[in-house]
Amino acid sequence: RGLGDVYKRQDIFFNYAKSAEEKGFKVIIAGAGKAAHLPGMCAAIFPMPVIGIPMHTTSLGGRDSLYSIVQMPSGIPVATVAINGGANAGLLAAKILATSDAALLDRLKAYSQSLKESVQKKDAHLQEVGYKNYNK
């Protein structure tokens, strides 16, 4: 669920973060740009893991967001993925959840195997046609 601008909707944000545990949330993924306070504020309120996604910004390309999320004070950790790294944030959350869900762990293992097979297939094609003809 999107919260929009946390600065303009503080009451909704605080209620959401405070009630996440009782709603059964095991991890929160929070994307934010610029000053990127949303992931850190979630981590300060929510006792489970928080994954921060720094969003690309026009002024600094997302580095401002990245630094804001990565530089959390001691005791308030936020796992941080790459700028616009939503896919990896989802995978990281799935891996956290898989520590207590065998079926999810099996699906993650199958996904990892499919990635490995995809790379092996691409490598075989590269070896066959050479780098000059690879994308033709």
Locations of regions flagged by a protein language model:
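Short, small-residue-biased leader/transition segments that mark boundaries at the very start
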Residues: 2-7
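Structural motif
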Residues: 8-18
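Glycine-rich phosphate-binding loop
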Residues: 16-54
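Long, charge-patterned amphipathic alpha-helical coiled-coil/hairpin "stalk" segments used as oligomerization
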Residues: 38, 42-82
